Amino acid sequence: MAEYGTLLQDLTNNITLEDLEQLKSACKEDIPSEKSEEITTGSAWFSFLESHNKLDKDNLSYIEHIFEISRRPDLLTMVVDYRTRVLKISEEEELDTKLTRIPSAKKYKDIIRQPSEEEIIKLAPPPKKA
């Protein structure tokens, strides 16, 4: 799948050495320290994740989570765009698939919604100055 390779290349091009250290730190529980030292490029990081079943063309949830906690919305947006455009999976559908970032999210699926007009708390106007 050429789109997947393009996605990884685009992500790699947007990851600096400083970013890479932050990303490795965010997933330090999954990367042994001796391996972490060997990972010196974004592509090496992606290769490590692929070889340890944390990443593949149909499952990007791990890096979505890492980009989210690393505060990299630009990288996360690229992954979400790939997921919706290439894999044809939207945010709503994601709750019902294996791509769910947080497994416990399924039980809250029906709770996550906009409040109805009756549920919105109305605030009183501010007091008038004397």
Curated annotation (Swiss-Prot):
Residues 98-107, 122-129 are annotated as: Microtubule-binding. One of its GO terms (molecular function) is protein kinase C binding. PROSITE patterns: DED. Its main location: cytoplasm. Phosphorylated by protein kinase C and calcium-calmodulin-dependent protein kinase. These phosphorylation events are modulated by neurotransmitters or hormones. The modification Phosphoserine is found at residues 61, 90, 104, 116. Predominantly expressed in the brain. Low levels in some peripheral organs. GO terms for cellular component: cytosol; microtubule associated complex; nucleoplasm. It is found in: Cytoplasm. One of its GO terms (biological process) is positive regulation of extrinsic apoptotic signaling pathway via death domain receptors. Increases PLD1 and PLD2 levels, possibly by stabilizing the protein. Binds RPS6KA3, MAPK3 and MAPK1. Interacts with CASP8 and FADD. Transient interaction with PLD1 and PLD2. Blocks Ras-mediated inhibition of integrin activation and modulates the ERK MAP kinase cascade. Inhibits RPS6KA3 activities by retaining it in the cytoplasm. Inhibits both TNFRSF6- and TNFRSF1A-mediated CASP8 activity and apoptosis. Regulates glucose transport by controlling both the content of SLC2A1 glucose transporters on the plasma membrane and the insulin-dependent trafficking of SLC2A4 from the cell interior to the surface. This is Astrocytic phosphoprotein PEA-15.
